Amino acid sequence: FFEKGIIGFPDCNQFTLISDLKEDGSPKGISWLQSLDEPAFALPVMDPLLVKEDYRPWIAEEMLKPLGDLNEENIYILVSVTATEDITKLSVNLKAPFIINAEERKGHQIIVEDDFPVKFMVYDILKAKKEEAGE
């Protein structure tokens, strides 16, 4: 439940996360944040650590309070993915992550104060990781 909706969609509060999972239960690659209020709306999202291993945005504690008690076991941080016809232009938005408490089923999209880009290009990073993994 996103009490305040998400940026650009303030009336979409109910979402489900659709993911293809690895053996450890973590999402692999791109997942979908599917609106239950507006069935035609689904947003591609991914774990930012897949493309920026040092991604640690500073988030004010009061922004996280509505989500309940967060810990490494129940927190998901996801970023939106933007794809164009040219797949090499694939990018993620590191400026406005989604913070989700999986146990409480509550989420919030936050604009972080850190100097992260709205368009962080990821195609080459993902391609290199696939090649490393032999895929």
What residue ranges belong to the model's regions?
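Extended catalytic/binding region for NAD+/ADP-ribose chemistry, centered on the ART fold
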Residues: 54-59
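Long, compositionally biased stretches
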Residues: 1-52, 72-135
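Short active-site loop/helix that positions an aromatic residue
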Residues: 61-71
